[in-house]
Amino acid sequence: MTPDDLLEEFRAAGALLEGHFILSSGLHSAVFLQKMAIFSDPVRTERVCAGLAALIRARYGAVDIVVSPAIGGIVPGYETARALGARAIFVERDPGGPFQLRRGFSIPAGARAVMVEDIVTTGLSSRECLAALKAEPGEIVGAACLIDRSGGRADLGAPLVALATLDIPNYPADQLPPELAAIPAVKPGSRAMKAS
């Protein structure tokens, strides 16, 4: 799957939105990628995650385990693991706490794991997920995502491959361009934010 193929999947699903959005990172953007419009369609999800699995194979070789951050990463992580013939596990957190492997999940010695995300903006969830895996005896070979909207600038502390890399501007609330400030903001994301 090419980057253009993936973006066409987002367009066809009505998942490429324009307006004024508050992202889960707290940053503001004129573009929002509504991944759940993709993941609510099992056939489309299978197609895009098979593309991600092919990219993972090409970059990292065989992997045994796909790890994703809950909740948003569970569906693409599971479907990518299925395409790779790997096991799917996830990290989760108590409210306000760090990510951790629970439910008996582990990355045993000798296992090769990749962290799979849906969309990377700042890389915060990915970094937190990878930090939770450092104590595991298995090898974390790298990270992968459907879309890196940071233009390749997000530093995860691990190699990252993306089906598509976009350079979508994001702004702190106090640095909005006038055309964005003129549009009422909506918050379609999933991560809880602290009131400012």
From Swiss-Prot:
Its cofactor is Mg(2+). Keywords: Glycosyltransferase, Magnesium, Pyrimidine biosynthesis, Transferase. GO terms for molecular function: magnesium ion binding; orotate phosphoribosyltransferase activity. Pathway: Pyrimidine metabolism; UMP biosynthesis via de novo pathway; UMP from orotate: step 1/2. Orotate binds at residues 121, 149. GO terms for biological process: 'de novo' UMP biosynthetic process; pyrimidine nucleobase biosynthetic process. Coiled coil: none annotated. 5-phospho-alpha-D-ribose 1-diphosphate binds at residues 117-125. InterPro entries: OPRT, Orotate_PRibTrfase_bac, PRibTrfase_dom, PRTase-like. Its EC number is 2.4.2.10. Belongs to the purine/pyrimidine phosphoribosyltransferase family. PyrE subfamily. Catalyzes the transfer of a ribosyl phosphate group from 5-phosphoribose 1-diphosphate to orotate, leading to the formation of orotidine monophosphate (OMP). This is Orotate phosphoribosyltransferase. The lineage of its organism: Bacteria, Pseudomonadati, Pseudomonadota, Alphaproteobacteria, Hyphomicrobiales.
